[in-house]
From Swiss-Prot:
It comes from Arabidopsis thaliana (Mouse-ear cress). GO terms for biological process: plant-type secondary cell wall biogenesis; regulation of secondary cell wall biogenesis; xylem development. The gene is IQD14. GO terms for molecular function: calmodulin binding. Residues 16-54, 66-305, 399-431, 476-561 are annotated as: Disordered. This is Protein IQ-DOMAIN 14.
Length: 668
């Protein structure tokens, strides 16, 4: 079907008023505006939306209409006010208007699917109907008398009815259908969608032209009986059928008698259309130029201008559509990308702020923890250093005290005065002398020496002596000495460890003394003691200051080496008498040496002792006496502790350490 916008633009070009006719056409324009207001919001039959773009070139019909306008100058005369009754039998004849071949602007009927009648296809040489007084009233419902169709080439009768102004009677009356034979005699083949425009009143181009109106019976006979002579426009239409067919893809369809039914019976409700310029009767009489004249800006609506601009736009092809779609997609994707980028940038900024704060807080906490750990470690290290320093100081002090004690073992820490110490030393010396006397007496008696049984069974010995013998094992078997040798031992051949001291078991000094066969020596004896003075003596004078590990000898060690008859328990005559019956007569004779009394007559005195750098010398000479001379017992200095016989230094036979003690020197 043909687009309606082109016909509407053609109608606008035909009926465009001039600026000088503005005052004369003012009432008509006002009535047109009033009509438009009544029909606002509805599209009339055949009207299209002006905002829809139309992509096509001008059709051949429009070109033909343009040529027809150039060939014929249509002059519209205003109709007379006294119009005969439209329903009269004989319409008054009208002189033929010079616009016989002028194209009639297309009515909105072009949208109807029916094939236009031959009378509608040819340009009707009808002069515009004179406006009746009712024409000024918009949408008049009274029927308008048809204008007489005089001087038509096809001997047209007056117009049966005005399609643009339906009357009330005809609108209420049922529409009369035209017989199919009315359009059959026309042999012209034209597209059903291309009706030729007919010159009509300005209201013919208005939307009211599409309203269906039943044709009057008076108007039909001239159309049916009188053959219409071919007009120049019809000839041109017949001459250019290929152009019509090429412009319209639809094939021609034979007219059917039912084609007019939709147009007559069912008028399409349409939205209001912008007011189109309507020419008044005086404007119809103005001569028309042969060429289409561009409408003035004041008379052409913006919609018409817009439609004129886009009418000749070519239809977009597939590459153009693809390019347009690509551009649209690119713009949309760019917009979405920018939007997402902005959102992402804000999110990243927010995350940076939050993470920066959290990282800062974590760093602060970590630094605090590290500072606390370092502080604790430093405190622990300082305490360890202090402990090590204190320990080193303690060890140093202990070593210093140990060194001082080791170098100053002869320190006397007693609170006694010098006189008291001297008196005690004198008493100890006297005790030692008494012990020597008792030992000499014991050595003169060999009863207990040759017979161990007599020693154990001797009831004259005190009880502690037997207990000590039972507690101390024998170091070596007691050698039996023959009579000719006359070898006398100073002490019993038993080790005498101290039960109260540990070091006394390790340090035993044996007295290696061999007496002559004649008599035991009771002369001066030399005792070699270790360099360290030994604090011994009777329990009566012991002060208990020596330690067990420092002093290997105790006062109790003298118990193991005590003679059977100490000085304070000298055997009486009765005791000797008791011992003599139990002894051997031979030993009894041999056990009493001749020189016993003589030996005891030379006891050592205090003035015979002298201090010799850690040793005691109890003789005028430091060498042994010969066998014939009064010998002495010598305790050599160079012998070790364990190589000096069986005699213990701490025994009663040993010398007191306080004998001849030097004055104390602290820093020696």
């Amino acid at each position: 079907m043909v687009k309606k916008g082109s016909w509407f633009s053609a109608i606008k070009r035909v009926f465009t008023p001039h600026s000088k006719e503005k005052l004369a056409n003012e009432p008509e324009r006002k009535s047109g505006k009033e009509k438009k207001k009544k029909g606002f919001g509805k599209l009339r039959h055949g009207e299209t939306n002006s905002f829809l773009p139309i992509f096509r070139e001008p059709s051949s019909i429009e070109k033909i209409l343009g040529e027809a306008e150039r060939d014929h100058n249509l002059v519209f005369r205003p109709p007379t006010p006294d119009r005969p009754n439209p329903y009269s039998a004989s319409p008054p004849p009208r002189p033929a208007s010079p616009r016989v071949a002028s194209p009639r602007p297309t009515s909105p009927r072009v949208a109807s699917p029916r094939v236009p009648s031959p009378r509608a296809e040819v340009p009707r040489t009808l002069s515009p109907k004179p406006p009746s007084p009712r024409a000024e009233v918009p949408r008049s419902l009274s029927p308008k008398p048809p204008s007489p169709r005089a001087d038509l080439p096809r001997s047209l009768s007056p117009k049966p009815f005005d399609r643009s102004k339906p009357s009330s009677a005809s609108a209420n009356a049922p529409p009369t259908l035209r017989p199919a034979s009315t359009r059959v005699p026309s042999q012209r083949i034209t597209p059903h969608s291309v009706p030729s425009p007919r010159p009509s009143s300005p209201r013919g181009a208005s939307p009211q032209a599409i309203s269906s109106k039943p044709p009057s019976p008076r108007a039909e006979p001239p159309t049916l009986d009188t053959p219409r002579p071919p007009s120049p426009r019809a000839a041109s239409l017949r001459a250019d059928p290929p152009r019509l067919d090429a412009a319209r893809p639809t094939t021609p369809r034979p007219p059917s008698p039912l084609a007019d039914a939709p147009r007559l019976d069912a008028p399409r409700p349409t939205t209001p259309k912008p007011p189109s310029p309507r020419s008044d009767p005086p404007r119809l009489d103005a001569p028309r130029p042969t060429t289409p004249k561009p409408p003035s800006p004041r008379s052409v609506s913006p919609r018409a201008v817009q439609r004129r601009e886009i009418v000749y736009r070519p239809e977009p092809t597939l590459p153009v559509q693809h390019a347009s779609a690509t551009k649209i997609q690119g713009a949309f994707r760019g917009y979405m990308a920018r939007k997402s980028f902005r959102a992402l940038k804000g999110l990243v900024r927010l995350q940076g702020v939050v993470r920066g704060y959290s990282v800062k807080r974590q760093t602060i906490n970590a630094m605090k923890y590290m500072q606390q750990v370092v502080r604790v470690q430093s405190q622990i290290q300082s305490r360890r250093i202090k402990m090590l320093e204190n320990q080193a100081q303690v060890e140093k002090d202990e070593a210093k005290w140990a060194a001082s004690e080791a170098g100053n073992d002869n320190w006397d820490d007693s609170v006694l005065t010098k006189e008291e110490r001297d008196s005690r030393s004198q008493r100890k010396t006297d005790a030692i002398i008494k012990r020597e006397r008792s030992m000499a007496y014991a050595y003169s008696r060999k009863l207990w020496k040759n017979s161990p049984k007599s020693t154990q069974d001797n009831r004259s010995f005190p009880q502690w002596w037997n207990w000590v013998d039972r507690q101390n094992p024998l170091a070596s078997p007691a050698p039996s000495y023959s009579q000719p040798q006359r070898d006398f031992r100073l002490t019993p051949s038993r080790l005498c460890p101290s039960p109260l001291s540990q070091s006394s078991k390790q340090h035993h000094i044996r007295l290696d003394n061999h007496f002559d066969t004649s008599t035991p020596r009771s002369s001066r004896s030399t005792f070699h003691t270790p360099s360290r003075p030994i604090h011994t003596g009777t329990s009566r004078y012991s002060r208990g200051r020596l330690r067990g590990q420092d002093s290997p000898f105790k006062d109790d060690d003298s118990l193991t080496s005590c003679p059977p008859f100490p000085s304070y328990m000298a055997p009486t005559v009765s005791a000797k008498a008791k011992v003599r019956p139990n002894s051997n007569p031979k030993e009894r004779v041999m056990g009493t040496p001749v020189s016993e009394k003589r030996r005891m007559s030379y006891p050592p005195t205090q003035d015979t002792f002298r201090w010799n750098k850690g040793s005691l010398v109890m003789s005028n000479s430091s060498s042994h006496r010969g066998p014939g001379s009064p010998g002495g017992v010598v305790l050599e200095k160079h012998k070790t502790l364990k190589s000096v016989g069986n005699l213990s230094i701490g025994s009663t036979a040993s010398m007191a350490t306080t004998v001849g003690r030097k004055e104390f020197n602290r820093f020696v």
